[in-house]
Amino acid sequence: AKALSITQSTEVGTVYDLDVLDGIHESVQRFDLSWHMDGARFANAIATLDVAPKEVTWKRGVDVLCLGGTKNGMAVGDCVVFFNRDLGKEFEYRCKQAGQLASKMRFLAAPWVGLLTDDVWLQNARHANGMANKLAQGLQQLGVRIAAPVESNAIFAAFTSEQTNVLRELGWIFYEFSGVGTARLMCSWKTTDAEIERLLADCESIVTPLAQAQDN
Protein backbone atom coordinates (compact mmCIF):
# COMPACT_ATOMS: atom_id res chain seq x y z
CA ALA A 1 0.00 0.00 0.00
CA LYS A 2 1.19 3.50 -0.81
CA ALA A 3 0.54 6.57 1.27
CA LEU A 4 1.02 10.31 1.28
CA SER A 5 2.14 11.92 4.53
CA ILE A 6 1.99 15.64 5.27
CA THR A 7 2.80 17.64 8.38
CA GLN A 8 0.18 20.04 9.76
CA SER A 9 1.46 22.57 10.67
CA THR A 10 4.51 22.20 8.43
CA GLU A 11 8.18 22.02 9.31
CA VAL A 12 8.54 25.71 8.48
CA GLY A 13 5.55 26.75 10.56
CA THR A 14 3.05 27.29 7.76
CA VAL A 15 -0.44 25.80 7.68
CA TYR A 16 -2.29 23.92 4.95
CA ASP A 17 -5.60 25.74 4.48
CA LEU A 18 -8.86 24.10 3.38
CA ASP A 19 -8.39 24.82 -0.32
CA VAL A 20 -4.92 23.30 -0.35
CA LEU A 21 -6.18 20.25 1.53
CA ASP A 22 -8.94 19.84 -1.06
CA GLY A 23 -6.30 19.84 -3.78
CA ILE A 24 -4.23 17.26 -1.93
CA HIS A 25 -7.32 15.10 -1.51
CA GLU A 26 -7.88 15.14 -5.27
CA SER A 27 -4.32 13.90 -5.83
CA VAL A 28 -4.70 11.23 -3.15
CA GLN A 29 -7.82 9.93 -4.87
CA ARG A 30 -6.28 10.10 -8.32
CA PHE A 31 -3.30 7.98 -7.33
CA ASP A 32 -5.23 5.70 -4.96
CA LEU A 33 -3.18 6.61 -1.90
CA SER A 34 -3.83 6.45 1.80
CA TRP A 35 -3.41 9.81 3.53
CA HIS A 36 -1.52 10.28 6.78
CA MET A 37 -1.36 13.60 8.62
CA ASP A 38 1.52 14.18 11.02
CA GLY A 39 -0.14 16.43 13.58
CA ALA A 40 2.69 17.01 16.02
CA ARG A 41 1.53 20.65 15.99
CA PHE A 42 -2.01 19.96 14.80
CA ALA A 43 -3.43 22.10 17.61
CA ASN A 44 -1.46 25.10 16.37
CA ALA A 45 -2.88 24.63 12.89
CA ILE A 46 -6.44 24.40 14.21
CA ALA A 47 -5.89 27.52 16.32
CA THR A 48 -4.81 29.40 13.19
CA LEU A 49 -7.50 28.10 10.85
CA ASP A 50 -10.21 28.48 13.53
CA VAL A 51 -12.19 25.51 12.26
CA ALA A 52 -13.35 22.24 13.78
CA PRO A 53 -10.73 19.47 13.58
CA LYS A 54 -13.00 17.40 11.33
CA GLU A 55 -12.78 20.12 8.67
CA VAL A 56 -9.09 19.42 8.08
CA THR A 57 -9.07 15.67 8.66
CA TRP A 58 -11.69 13.08 7.73
CA LYS A 59 -13.94 15.54 5.87
CA ARG A 60 -10.97 16.23 3.59
CA GLY A 61 -10.15 12.54 3.18
CA VAL A 62 -7.42 12.08 5.78
CA ASP A 63 -7.18 8.40 6.79
CA VAL A 64 -4.87 8.61 9.80
CA LEU A 65 -3.96 11.48 12.14
CA CYS A 66 -1.11 11.51 14.62
CA LEU A 67 -2.29 14.06 17.17
CA GLY A 68 0.58 15.68 19.02
CA GLY A 69 0.59 15.96 22.78
CA THR A 70 4.24 16.37 23.71
CA LYS A 71 4.54 19.68 21.83
CA ASN A 72 1.38 21.06 23.39
CA GLY A 73 1.81 20.64 27.12
CA MET A 74 2.10 16.90 27.72
CA ALA A 75 5.22 15.30 29.16
CA VAL A 76 5.03 12.27 26.87
CA GLY A 77 2.65 10.65 24.42
CA ASP A 78 0.98 11.34 21.12
CA CYS A 79 -2.34 9.94 19.93
CA VAL A 80 -3.03 8.02 16.72
CA VAL A 81 -6.53 8.44 15.29
CA PHE A 82 -7.73 6.10 12.54
CA PHE A 83 -10.55 7.58 10.48
CA ASN A 84 -10.15 4.64 8.12
CA ARG A 85 -10.73 1.81 10.59
CA ASP A 86 -9.35 -0.82 8.22
CA LEU A 87 -5.90 0.75 8.50
CA GLY A 88 -6.06 0.36 12.28
CA LYS A 89 -6.42 -3.40 12.28
CA GLU A 90 -3.83 -5.08 14.53
CA PHE A 91 -2.43 -1.66 15.42
CA GLU A 92 -1.93 -2.70 19.04
CA TYR A 93 0.21 -5.61 17.86
CA ARG A 94 2.27 -3.37 15.61
CA CYS A 95 2.82 -0.94 18.49
CA LYS A 96 4.08 -3.78 20.64
CA GLN A 97 6.41 -5.03 17.92
CA ALA A 98 7.79 -1.49 17.52
CA GLY A 99 8.45 -1.12 21.24
CA GLN A 100 5.71 1.48 21.70
CA LEU A 101 3.57 -0.41 24.22
CA ALA A 102 4.27 0.57 27.83
CA SER A 103 3.30 -1.73 30.69
CA LYS A 104 1.42 1.14 32.36
CA MET A 105 -0.07 2.62 29.20
CA ARG A 106 -2.95 4.16 31.14
CA PHE A 107 -0.52 6.61 32.76
CA LEU A 108 0.49 7.82 29.30
CA ALA A 109 -3.10 8.01 28.08
CA ALA A 110 -4.67 9.68 31.14
CA PRO A 111 -3.18 13.18 30.56
CA TRP A 112 -5.14 13.37 27.32
CA VAL A 113 -8.30 13.74 29.39
CA GLY A 114 -7.00 16.92 30.94
CA LEU A 115 -5.60 18.25 27.67
CA LEU A 116 -8.82 17.75 25.71
CA THR A 117 -11.23 18.86 28.46
CA ASP A 118 -12.50 22.45 28.15
CA ASP A 119 -10.37 22.99 25.02
CA VAL A 120 -7.13 23.21 26.99
CA TRP A 121 -5.27 21.88 23.95
CA LEU A 122 -6.54 24.80 21.86
CA GLN A 123 -5.87 27.36 24.58
CA ASN A 124 -2.28 26.15 24.77
CA ALA A 125 -1.90 26.36 20.99
CA ARG A 126 -3.46 29.82 20.73
CA HIS A 127 -1.10 31.08 23.41
CA ALA A 128 1.93 29.62 21.62
CA ASN A 129 0.83 31.09 18.29
CA GLY A 130 0.24 34.48 19.89
CA MET A 131 3.70 34.52 21.42
CA ALA A 132 5.22 33.60 18.06
CA ASN A 133 3.43 36.46 16.33
CA LYS A 134 4.55 38.88 19.02
CA LEU A 135 8.16 37.75 18.62
CA ALA A 136 7.99 37.93 14.83
CA GLN A 137 6.57 41.46 14.88
CA GLY A 138 9.26 42.58 17.30
CA LEU A 139 12.03 41.10 15.18
CA GLN A 140 10.67 42.71 12.03
CA GLN A 141 10.64 46.08 13.77
CA LEU A 142 14.34 45.55 14.43
CA GLY A 143 14.91 44.87 10.73
CA VAL A 144 15.32 41.11 11.04
CA ARG A 145 13.92 39.26 8.04
CA ILE A 146 11.43 36.50 8.81
CA ALA A 147 12.09 33.73 6.30
CA ALA A 148 8.65 32.06 6.34
CA PRO A 149 5.11 33.21 7.13
CA VAL A 150 4.36 32.90 10.84
CA GLU A 151 1.20 30.81 10.88
CA SER A 152 1.77 28.66 13.97
CA ASN A 153 4.30 28.77 16.81
CA ALA A 154 7.50 28.82 14.74
CA ILE A 155 9.60 31.78 13.66
CA PHE A 156 12.47 31.45 11.19
CA ALA A 157 14.66 34.49 11.70
CA ALA A 158 17.37 35.31 9.17
CA PHE A 159 20.09 36.37 11.58
CA THR A 160 23.64 36.79 10.38
CA SER A 161 26.25 34.30 11.54
CA GLU A 162 27.62 36.94 13.92
CA GLN A 163 24.20 37.60 15.41
CA THR A 164 23.56 33.88 15.80
CA ASN A 165 26.83 33.40 17.65
CA VAL A 166 26.22 36.32 20.00
CA LEU A 167 22.69 35.14 20.84
CA ARG A 168 24.07 31.75 21.78
CA GLU A 169 26.73 33.39 23.94
CA LEU A 170 23.89 35.21 25.71
CA GLY A 171 22.36 31.85 26.57
CA TRP A 172 19.65 31.42 23.94
CA ILE A 173 19.30 27.90 22.59
CA PHE A 174 17.93 27.26 19.12
CA TYR A 175 18.53 25.29 15.93
CA GLU A 176 19.67 26.68 12.62
CA PHE A 177 17.36 25.58 9.85
CA SER A 178 17.93 25.36 6.08
CA GLY A 179 21.43 26.74 6.19
CA VAL A 180 23.56 28.95 8.38
CA GLY A 181 21.89 32.09 9.64
CA THR A 182 18.24 31.00 9.74
CA ALA A 183 17.33 30.50 13.38
CA ARG A 184 14.36 28.30 14.23
CA LEU A 185 12.69 29.95 17.20
CA MET A 186 9.82 28.06 18.81
CA CYS A 187 7.20 29.39 21.23
CA SER A 188 5.32 27.00 23.48
CA TRP A 189 2.20 26.83 25.61
CA LYS A 190 4.22 28.23 28.51
CA THR A 191 6.22 30.97 26.78
CA THR A 192 5.76 34.24 28.65
CA ASP A 193 5.62 37.87 27.57
CA ALA A 194 8.67 38.48 29.74
CA GLU A 195 10.68 35.87 27.84
CA ILE A 196 9.71 37.40 24.50
CA GLU A 197 10.65 40.87 25.69
CA ARG A 198 13.98 39.63 27.04
CA LEU A 199 14.85 37.94 23.74
CA LEU A 200 13.85 41.04 21.77
CA ALA A 201 15.99 43.19 24.05
CA ASP A 202 18.98 40.94 23.44
CA CYS A 203 18.29 40.99 19.71
CA GLU A 204 18.11 44.78 19.73
CA SER A 205 21.43 44.97 21.55
CA ILE A 206 23.18 42.98 18.83
CA VAL A 207 21.30 43.97 15.68
CA THR A 208 21.84 47.71 15.98
CA PRO A 209 25.58 47.66 16.84
CA LEU A 210 26.33 45.13 14.10
CA ALA A 211 24.34 47.14 11.57
CA GLN A 212 26.20 50.32 12.55
CA ALA A 213 29.54 48.53 12.27
CA GLN A 214 28.67 47.34 8.76
CA ASP A 215 27.64 50.87 7.74
CA ASN A 216 31.00 52.19 8.92
Would you name each region that the model predicts?
Residues 1-170, 175-191, 199-216:
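Conserved PLP-enzyme active-site core in the AAT-like
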